[in-house]
Amino acid sequence: MNLETIIGLEVHVELKTNSKIFSASPTEFGAEPNTQTSVIDLGYPGVLPTLNKEAVNFAMKAAMALNCEIATETKFDRKNYFYPDNPKAYQISQFDKPIGENGWIEIEVDGKKKRIGITRLHLEEDAGKSTHTADGSLVDYNRQGMPLIEIVSEPDMRTPEEAYAYLEKLKSIIQYTGVSDCKMEEGSLRCDANISLRPVGQEKFGTKAELKNLNSFTYVQKGLEFEQARQEKELLSGGIIQQETRRYDEATKKTILMRVKEGSDDYRYFPEPDLVELYIDDEWKEAVRASIPELPDARKARYVAELGLPAYDAHVLTLTKEMSDFFEATVADGADAKLTSNWLMGEVLAYLNKQQKELKDVALTPAGLSKMVQLIEKGTISSKIAKKVFNELIEKGGDPEEIVKAKGLVQISDEGTLRKVVTEILDNNEQSIEDFKNGKDRAIGFLVGQIMKATKGQANPPLVNKILLEEINKR
C-alpha cells in the first residue's frame, strides 16, 4: 500500500502594535512579569474591550499580502475554555466571519513551484504564559491580550520539506509588510502542525495528529518527518491511528503523546456581546492596500531583471527584509550588485550564523561594505586581503580605506615590482618550471603560492599569473 502524506499548518503571528488588541496596555517584550496588564486584560467584572484599529489595519495588510479576500463585514466571538493562563475563561477570537479568506502563497522545493492555499486569517487575543516549576505553576499575564493573527493553511502540503518552505515564505512575507518581527524565540511566531496519511488515490483524509512545541522551522520539519514515519509504520503493520495531540521532544527527536482526542473541541463559540460588528468599506481596504511595500517575490524578480543577479542569489537575498534592505543600500552606495551578493551570501551569512546574530547586531554597515567592494573592484585590494578588512569591519566598523592604509594591505599592482619578485621565485624553483613545461599544471599553483607568500598575500593575482607565464616562456 502506497501512502500519501497530508500536512496543514496553523501559524500564530503576534502583531507589532504599541498597545494590546482590546486595551491600552503596552506590548513591550521582556518586561517584568505581570507589569503590562490591566483590568481589561485580566477580565475584571464590568470592564469593556475597545478594539485597536491598528491591529485591524495590520491584520488586513497581512491578509492582502497573502492574497486573501478581505471581508466587508466581520465580527468577534467568544471562544470559551478554562485554563489558568486565560483569566476571563474565554478568548475573544473570530469564528465564522474571519477578516481574510481564500488566500495563497507560492513555494519552491527542488526547483518545482507549488501554490499552497490559505483557508483563513483571523484576529484574536493571546493568552498569558504559564511556567511550571517543581514548586508549582506561575502565570505571567503580560502576553494576555496581545494582538494575534492566526493563519490557517489548506492541507496542501505533501512533505515536511514543503512545510518548511511554506513557513519560510510566510515569515518572509509577513516581515516585509512590517506588521510583525516574526521572532520564534520571543514567541511572536508560533506554529502547530496537523499531519495524516492516506492511501494514494483516496479522497478522504486519514486520522490526523496535531504537533505542538515546535520551536523552530527545523523542528517543524523534523517533527513532521518523525510523525510521518511513525504513522506509516503503524498503518502498514495493520494498526490504526488515533486522533492525538503530540509534542516534539528536541532531546530525543521524537514526538511524544500529550493527550488523545475523542472528538473535536467544543468551545461553544458565540458572538462577542461587548463588540459591534465591524464594517470594512472599499476606501478603508484601498488605504491599507496602498501601504503594502514591495514584497519578496516582486523584489526577487527585480533583482534578476534589473541587476542581473542569478535567481538563486535573488532568492537568498530576499528571504529576509533585513538582508534585502542591506543589499539595496550597499548597491545604492555604488557597489557592484553581484560582488555585493557574493559577500553577503558568503562571508556575512557565515559570520552571522556562527555568531547567532542578525545584521543589526554587528558593526558592519552598507556604506562600509560598499567601500570595501569598490576597493576590490578598483584592484586596490584582492579578495583575499578583503577578508582581513571584512573581519575588522564586522567586528569594529570603520572606514575600509583607513583600515587598508593602517594595516598596509594595499594590493601590489606595480608590474615592475611584481616582475622582480616573480624572477626571484623562478630562479629558486627551476624544477617547478620543468614540471610545468612537462604538463604538470599543479606546478604553476605552487609558484603562485610562493609569490603570494613573498608578498604577504598582497600581489595582484591576475597580474601575477600574466607575468609568471611570460617569464616561464622566456626560459
UniProtKB/Swiss-Prot annotation:
PROSITE patterns: GATB (PS01234). The keyword Protein biosynthesis applies. Keywords: ATP-binding, Ligase, Nucleotide-binding, Protein biosynthesis. It comes from the Bacteria. This is Aspartyl/glutamyl-tRNA(Asn/Gln) amidotransferase subunit B. It is an enzyme of class 6 (ligase). Belongs to the GatB/GatE family. GatB subfamily. Heterotrimer of A, B and C subunits. It catalyses: L-glutamyl-tRNA(Gln) + L-glutamine + ATP + H2O = L-glutaminyl-tRNA(Gln) + L-glutamate + ADP + phosphate + H(+); L-aspartyl-tRNA(Asn) + L-glutamine + ATP + H2O = L-asparaginyl-tRNA(Asn) + L-glutamate + ADP + phosphate + 2 H(+). Allows the formation of correctly charged Asn-tRNA(Asn) or Gln-tRNA(Gln) through the transamidation of misacylated Asp-tRNA(Asn) or Glu-tRNA(Gln) in organisms which lack either or both of asparaginyl-tRNA or glutaminyl-tRNA synthetases. The reaction takes place in the presence of glutamine and ATP through an activated phospho-Asp-tRNA(Asn) or phospho-Glu-tRNA(Gln). NCBIfam families: gatB (TIGR00133), PRK05477.1-1 (NF004011), PRK05477.1-2 (NF004012), PRK05477.1-4 (NF004014). Pfam families: GatB_N, GatB_Yqey.
